Amino acid sequence: MESHDEIMARLALAEAVAREGGATALSYFNRRETLVVETKYDLQDVVSIADREVEQLIASRIRDAFPADGFLGEESGLQVGESDYTWVVDPIDGTSPFLNGMPSWCVSVAVLRGDVPVIGVIFAPTYQECYVAALGQGATLNGHRLQVDPTRTLQNHVTGFGANSYVSPQQVGEIVAALLSAGGNFIRIGSGALMLAWVAAGRVVGYYEPYMHAWDCLAGYCLVKEAGGWYHPFNTEGDRITKGAQVLAVAPGAEADLRRIAGL
């Protein structure tokens, strides 16, 4: 019971900070032409003051409520905590769509207990959609229960796919060819976190990305699991939580095909 209460207390805060951070991000989105944009890893990996301010806001709220918890943010890195819980936050997943006036971006907030994602909240402000999940509590979208459809397959639905400059053009081509050869089709929107939420919502049958970070995927993983899907575990032990890895989440009807394509 104590563990349940701990999770539910953090769930309430996770949704609150995702919504508050999303409102701040949306205010920047509506005046994005004023933002100064910087590059990180390469010219396609961009960041602005909006990312940093939203992350600082969320981190501050978490620190005030649960000072012993750990925190990993895309912009600020890892602060190891003293409790069993670690918050994993992407303040704006889909910065490129965000900066270019497209709606496909979101705020992603996950909470780990040990190495298990026990809370996942993804808020997409432009759609006014809030996806919420907690261990054993199911997944919801704006309060409505989510459940993946077991009749959906690679062949009768669409698959989400993402890639970045960590993935070679040759590998991207091979994955796309394998998807199409298996009778599937794919979509890419620029936000892996949001596409993972779409797996839970049944909008795509699965999502695969060969190299993704914890802050992009862990909230979505919790959502997919609680909606009845499967995900490939992400190594969160020690500093592995800061490293990229393969990410796959999928509904049951497409699991075998997508695991084969991903080599998992």
Where are these regions (language model features)?
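Short coil/turn connectors at secondary-structure junctions
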Residues: 67, 83-84, 115-118, 154-156, ...
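Short loop segments at secondary-structure junctions
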Residues: 112-116, 126, 135-138, 144, ...
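DPxDG-like acidic metal-binding loop motif
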Residues: 81-140
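An extended, acidic
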Residues: 147-264
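N-terminal subdomain of lithium-sensitive/metallo-dependent phosphomonoesterases centered on the IMPase/IPPase/PAP
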Residues: 1-92
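Solvent-exposed alpha-helices and their adjacent loops that cap or buttress functional pockets
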Residues: 39, 79-81, 114, 132, ...
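Small-residue (primarily alanine) positions within well-ordered alpha-helices
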Residues: 14, 18-21, 120, 139, ...
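Residue-level signal for inorganic ion chemistry
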Residues: 25, 51, 62, 95, ...
